[in-house]
């Protein structure tokens, strides 16, 4: 038995890293949802009565040691006490029932089934965290602190949880030079130049944040990968990250460039059926696993947007993926992205991934996962679910979501994305259940929005999307509202009235962005390359499917993309029980109307308005939604610290300006096409169309 502040002397390195990790000395957002702001009144008194001994079996396990340290951090904050007052009792003999005033850890209990599963049992006298493995105790600690941080009484906390999906992964689009593709929160957090000798303490805080929401895998580099990241010097760098993150239950993955045997291996080809190529990849995998025994595997973007792949040699995606899968063997996984479209394919771009991959169903190796974007186009503010979900019944598939807001405002304002992801997860595929039910046995990936900015995500509210991704990957049955309230209570305030206001802002924010950027199912109307701002007038890019005009198809007669049997027939890729709901404009959800149908401007909608009138009304609704958010946030000044309140106020001022820009530029363009007057009482665009067309942003971030 040991007593004192220190946890386990054998883990001094971990403790040192935790102490070195940057701590916010002001409310600057660095602490994210792990602020552990002091409780007040009876809530603090209830918790203080439990602030006695901590009994822990397996306390010398590094993950259990971290769980205890997280408990201490949380209690120190919630009770507003100095760390010097900590008292620890570490004992390998875990009491069968919790002593009074104690926290009890039982981290090797076979009665708790499932990897990462845990139970938290609270009473007025003790709180017990039980798990089958140390990682369950770490997750259980974060869950306990989440409940306490929302003001829950310890006696009322009764949790029994297991992750809904085994793989809960972040995909970083970070380049080794520090640039982040589609990144809007500064530079990359990965300091490759100084690894492996120097580990940035921020890597520990990053791991803490991920573990607190159940993220257990990280792809550290861009899918548009550099081959040299497979060289020995980078394997050594990756090993340092893997060693630091392992106690947090996080495995590292690499995006692999398919042509690496040719690029850095001295071979004349990267043909997956060439024995020398297969041998090169096998040797490379062996080299990585010798350094990192729990290496997760490779993520591959192949034959898409100029990236090399097996089709360069007349081979299929399955042949390419299976060659890599054989190299890795049972040690890890090959994650193969289904985001493909080709310049020489004149069919509807939204059909091409299905056409390429569905015929390959059942041909992929068991350790291959097909990673499918939420919709068939490209992370638009609203798309229908991807038709590949449910159509690959003999292939392991996972969902790819985008946490970074490439098409939803980038680094300005608020766009809470949990409702977007819930739309997809809850969608019935007509082929074996909802999207969530189909991907739950495998996993969910999110394109990260994390960068070097002090608050991690560029804006304070973008942290909610990182948080929501992790929570939904852990439990897709959670509602968007539940997650919003959880996050806001831990991030800003526990004041009930303020929480209701913040949650309402968040829940309406994505719909506002949809309305002022792409209402009624319009999509891909953004600026070229940087994807910032409106540009529905762009019609002359090299490839047709890069042009906004390709998608909206507006002229004086109408607007929209006919994807029914009379058009591209992409609707036929959905299950026969699902397609009919979108086949007739009269029964199509208005939110997807112009995604599936081309209609006359005078077409009458169920609202009683013409299509043109409804389109204008939606743009105005989007602007009004942002105005309401700004007013609601202004009302919260007494409840929010001045530093973050001012920062969000500035973000919303930018969003108000951008919403009007989108609205005005779009209406000016649609009027130039249809020749129609604005409905009575509608405010005209502030500038002529020519002024909007002249705006250029060569310096926009994230390109």
What annotation goes with each model-predicted range?
Residues 1-11:
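Bacterial N-terminal signal peptides that target proteins for export
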Residues 10-19:
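Sec-dependent N-terminal signal peptides
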Residues 21-23:
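N-terminal signal peptide c-region/cleavage motif recognized by signal peptidases
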Residues 26-124, 155:
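Acidic, contiguous N-terminal accessory segments
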Residues 56-61, 90-96, 105-109, 130-132, ...:
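Structural motif
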Residues 59-70, 74, 109-282, 290-297, ...:
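Feature activates predominantly on carbohydrate-active enzymes
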Residues 266-485, 491, 495:
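Catalytic-core regions of glycoside hydrolase
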Residues 437-702:
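C-terminal non-catalytic alpha-helical accessory regions
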């Amino acid at each position: 038995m040991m007593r004192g502040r220190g946890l386990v002397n054998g883990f001094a390195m971990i403790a040192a890293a935790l102490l070195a990790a940057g701590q916010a000395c002001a409310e600057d957002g660095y602490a994210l949802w792990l602020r552990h702001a002091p409780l007040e009144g009876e809530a603090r008194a209830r918790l203080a009565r439990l602030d006695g001994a901590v009994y822990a079996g397996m306390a010398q396990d590094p993950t259990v040691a971290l769980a205890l340290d997280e408990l201490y951090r949380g209690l120190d904050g919630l009770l507003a006490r100095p760390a010097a007052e900590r008292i620890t009792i570490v004992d390998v003999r875990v009491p069968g029932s919790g002593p009074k005033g104690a926290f009890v850890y039982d981290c090797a209990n076979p009665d708790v089934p499932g990897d990462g599963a845990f139970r938290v049992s609270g009473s007025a006298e003790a709180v017990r965290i039980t798990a089958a493995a140390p990682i369950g105790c770490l997750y259980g600690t974060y869950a306990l602190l989440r409940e306490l941080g929302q003001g829950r009484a310890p006696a009322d906390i009764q949790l029994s949880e297991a992750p809904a999906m085994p793989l809960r992964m972040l995909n970083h689009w970070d380049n080794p030079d520090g640039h982040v593709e589609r990144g809007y929160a500064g530079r990359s957090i990965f300091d490759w130049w100084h690894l492996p000798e120097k580990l940035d303490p921020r890597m520990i805080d990053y791991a803490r944040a991920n573990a607190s929401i159940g993220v257990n895998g990280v792809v550290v580099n861009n899918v548009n990968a550099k081959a040299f990241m497979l060289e020995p010097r980078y394997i050594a760098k990756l090993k340092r990250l893997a060693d630091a993150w392992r106690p947090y239950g996080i495995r590292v993955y690499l995006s692999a460039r398919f042509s690496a045997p040719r690029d850095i291996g001295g071979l004349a080809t990267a043909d997956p059926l060439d024995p020398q190529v297969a041998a090169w990849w096998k040797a490379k995998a062996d080299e990585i696993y010798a350094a990192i025994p729990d290496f997760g595997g490779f993520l591959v973007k192949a034959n898409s947007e100029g990236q090399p792949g097996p089709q360069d040699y007349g081979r299929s995606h399955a042949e390419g993926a299976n060659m890599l899968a054989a190299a890795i063997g049972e040690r890890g996984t090959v994650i193969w992205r289904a985001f493909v479209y080709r310049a020489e394919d004149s069919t509807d771009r939204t059909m091409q991934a299905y056409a390429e991959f569905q015929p390959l169903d059942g041909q992929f190796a068991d350790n291959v996962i097909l990673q499918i974007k939420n919709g068939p186009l490209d992370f638009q503010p609203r798309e229908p679910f991807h038709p590949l979900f449910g159509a690959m019944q003999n292939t392991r598939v996972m969902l790819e979501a985008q946490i970074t807001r490439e098409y939803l405002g980038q680094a300005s304002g608020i766009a809470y994305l949990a409702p977007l992801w819930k739309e997809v997860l809850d969608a019935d595929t007509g082929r074996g259940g909802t999207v969530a039910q189909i991907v739950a046995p495998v996993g969910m990936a999110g394109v990260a929005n994390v960068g070097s900015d002090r608050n991690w995500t560029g804006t304070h509210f973008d942290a909610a999307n990182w948080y929501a991704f992790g929570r939904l990957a852990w439990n897709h049955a959670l509602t968007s509202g539940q997650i919003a309230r959880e996050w806001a209570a831990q991030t800003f305030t526990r004041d009930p009235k303020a929480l209701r206001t913040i949650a309402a802002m968040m829940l309406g924010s994505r719909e506002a962005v949809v309305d002022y950027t792409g209402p009624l199912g319009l999509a891909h109307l953004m600026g070229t390359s940087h994807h910032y701002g409106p540009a529905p007038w762009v019609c002359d890019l090299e490839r047709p499917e890069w042009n906004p005009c390709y998608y909206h198809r507006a002229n004086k007669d109408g607007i929209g993309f006919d994807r029914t049997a009379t058009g591209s027939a992409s609707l036929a890729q959905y299950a026969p029980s699902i397609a009919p709901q979108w086949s007739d404009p009269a029964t199509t959800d208005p939110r997807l109307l112009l995604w599936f149908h081309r209609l006359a401007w005078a077409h009458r909608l169920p609202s009683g308005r013409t299509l043109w009138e409804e389109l204008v009304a939606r743009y105005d609704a989007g602007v009004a939604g942002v105005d309401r958010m700004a007013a609601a946030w202004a009302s919260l000044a007494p409840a929010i610290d001045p530093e973050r309140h001012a920062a969000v106020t500035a973000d919303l001022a930018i969003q108000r300006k951008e919403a009007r820009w989108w609205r005005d530029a779009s209406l000016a363009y649609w009027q130039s096409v249809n020749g129609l007057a604005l409905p009575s009482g509608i405010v005209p665009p502030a500038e002529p169309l020519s002024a909007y067309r002249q705006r250029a942003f060569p310096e926009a971030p994230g390109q």
